[in-house]
Regions:
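Cytosolic-side membrane-insertion boundary helix
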Residues: 3, 61-85
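Acidic/histidine-rich catalytic neighborhood of metal-dependent amide-processing enzymes
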Residues: 4-37, 58-63, 95-119, 124-224
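Short beta-strand-to-loop junctions in surface cap/lid or active-site-entrance loops
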Residues: 37-46, 54
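Glycine- and small hydrophobic-enriched segments that form the cores of compact globular domains
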Residues: 46, 57-60, 68-71, 145
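Structural motif
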Residues: 48-51, 203-204
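Short intrinsically disordered coil segments
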Residues: 51-56, 67-69, 222-223
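C-terminal single-pass membrane-anchor helix
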Residues: 86-90
């Protein structure tokens, strides 16, 4: 039973959080979301396209970060849980071996009392279940008003400066549902696949998220 539960948990994690497959959606209530698109047309035929994107939805409050402004609670509890899980696994292997091999007093101790460490590890895992406060939505000024503002301002600045690109279309795409597994942009991409992939127009997308101080900026050119 334990192995089955572990497999199911890992399967859901890989499918939802690594591959972004939406196979769990039937279990949740459907709600309406919105994507917004602004387009600045070029001079002449559209041969190239630049899409600047930011997501409009905000995450629920993360308790460990909110209350850990002076003490790194997230790092502490993650270290507790991950470190404890590794040690618990090692102790479990030793306890199993001790059942078949005489390891003296040490082996007897592992068989009879190693469960105490498993219990301590479980306590650390419980703290992670309390990570998200589903009753409070974070204001989202950083994540991700900064991204949506940058996308909209790009078009606004081009307009104010009177810049009209030749054959290059510039778009501001504001998506919903990013915090819910990229559902907004995935839905938009599915509905506009032919328009943007099969149209023959070279398209590049710049996704802007959490645009903060320069020393913290990172540029990713592939899936993290």
């Amino acid at each position: 039973m334990y192995k089955r539960q572990v497999f199911v948990g890992l399967f859901i994690t890989v499918m939802e959080f690594l591959l972004y497959k939406q196979f769990m959606d039937p279990l949740y209530k459907k709600i309406e979301a919105h994507n917004l698109m602004g387009v600045r047309k070029p001079r002449g035929e559209v041969k190239r396209r630049i899409v600047i994107s930011g997501h409009i939805d905000a995450a629920y409050e993360w308790r460990h970060l909110y209350y850990g402004k002076k003490v790194p609670l997230m790092a502490i509890f993650m270290s507790w849980t991950i470190g404890g899980a590794i040690v618990s696994f090692i102790l479990s292997v030793i306890a199993i071996v001790a059942n078949f091999v005489d390891m003296g007093t040490f082996g007897d101790f592992m068989i009879n009392y190693s469960y105490i460490f498993h219990f301590v590890t479980a306590l650390g895992m419980v703290t992670l279940f309390m990570f998200v406060d589903f009753n409070t939505i974070s204001p989202g000024a950083n994540d991700n008003l900064t991204g949506t503002y940058a996308a909209v301002c790009a078009l606004r600045m081009l307009d104010m400066a009177g810049v009209d690109f030749e054959n290059t279309e510039v778009c501001a795409m504001i998506t919903d549902g990013e915090e819910a597994g990229l559902r907004g942009c995935k839905s938009w991409a599915k509905n506009h696949y032919d328009e943007y992939v099969n149209s023959g127009v070279e398209t590049v997308v710049l996704c802007v998220d959490t645009l903060t101080d320069r020393e913290y900026l990172r540029v990713y050119n592939k899936d993290m």
